[in-house]
A protein has these predicted regions:
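Short, well-formed alpha-helical segments that are part of the catalytic scaffolds
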Residues: 13-27
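Acidic donor-binding loop at a coil-to-helix junction in glycosyltransferase catalytic cores
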Residues: 165-174
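Glycine-rich, basic loop-to-helix element that forms the pyrophosphate-binding segment
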Residues: 58-74, 95
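A recurrent flexible, glycine/aromatic-enriched loop bordering the glycosyltransferase active site
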Residues: 114-117, 130-149, 164-165
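Non-catalytic, C-terminal membrane-associated alpha-helical segments of glycosyltransferases
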Residues: 205-212, 218, 222-275
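A conserved acidic beta->alpha catalytic loop
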Residues: 24, 37-45, 86
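Short aromatic/hydrophobic "clamp" motif used to bind/position activated sugar donors
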Residues: 79
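Conserved donor NDP-sugar-binding/catalytic core segment of glycosyltransferases
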Residues: 87, 91-121
Length: 275
């Protein structure tokens, strides 16, 4: 590998998925692997130590703070942020770095695909990615993993867990967008994501997203109307119509359900924290 890459993996209670994740990270031969364990109560840390000596255990922390802790600990300019449910193929890190350099981005997120489609929810999620996410180029909003970063950008901006402790993507990228002369977006590399087929896990994930959306609205009140439109109109109405027109029927149901659940928890969180 021409450039040295650090990999940061932030996890909590991920014993079921972490080993395969780290095997595939190791297969890509990064210069270092850093695992930030959010004080797991299972075998997460034990599994992490099989693949790296650089395991950081945090206490009374959150995902937003843990991401910055991992980034701060990295010794290289190029850092890949990988989560426990991501499944790399050999060469993915080099390809993701190529996307970063070719586009002169400070952050590039990969395209996404489902590691295994076991039911309509898995298929709907993958169809949604193909419709709305897997479009390479500069973007206004991206996710923070799986992604490649230039460490130097963190001289100008940091992950901030003040209020936004649950979901970090929206707050961080929104603040990044306000910096002059920065480019970020989606690359050509496609990385697999392993989600279970359990309906309750998807409901839990949508609730988690909605709580994060509510925190974002409290922190950035000027963006609240846009977020409300996103979850009350775009997700449950506009996205399903577009999905049906593109014959992505599973995506229509997936977006509708996600929009309703996220909107509910966004409202609950906004009202609770505003009280």
């Amino acid at each position: 590998m021409k450039y040295k890459i650090s990999v940061v993996v932030c996890v909590k209670n991920e014993e079921a998925r972490l080993e395969e994740c780290l095997k595939r990270v190791q297969m890509n031969e990064p210069d270092e692997i850093i695992v930030v364990d959010g004080d797991s109560s299972d075998r997460t840390a034990e599994i992490a130590y099989k693949y790296t000596d650089h395991v950081i255990t945090t206490h009374k922390s959150n995902l937003t703070r843990d991401r910055q802790i991992g980034l701060n600990a990295a010794r290289n300019e190029y850092i890949a942020m990988i989560d426990g449910d991501h499944r790399l193929e050999k060469g993915d890190l080099e390809l993701l770095l190529k996307d970063l350099l070719d586009n002169k981005f400070v952050i590039v997120q990969s395209q996404l695909k489902s590691f295994s489609n076991m039911n309509w929810m898995n298929r709907g999620e993958e169809q949604m990615w193909d419709l709305f996410h897997n479009i390479p180029g500069p973007k206004q909003m991206i996710g923070v993993a799986p992604a490649m970063y230039r460490k130097s950008i963190f001289e100008r901006i940091l992950f901030d867990d003040r209020i936004t402790k649950t979901i970090d993507d929206t707050d961080f990228i929104y603040r990044l967008s306000r910096l002059p002369d920065v480019r970020y977006g989606i690359g050509n590399t496609k990385i697999a994501q392993l989600h279970t087929d359990a309906y309750r896990d998807y409901i839990k994930k949508f609730k988690w997203y909605g709580i994060g959306d509510g925190e974002f609205c409290i922190k950035h009140r000027n963006r609240a109307p846009s977020m409300w439109f996103h979850l009350l109109i775009r997700y449950p109405l506009l996205y399903p119509v577009r999905a049906i027109l593109k014959r992505k029927i599973y995506a229509a149901g997936y977006c509708f359900l996600q929009g309703l659940i996220r909107a509910r928890w966004m409202v609950v969180t906004s009202m609770k924290k505003a009280a």
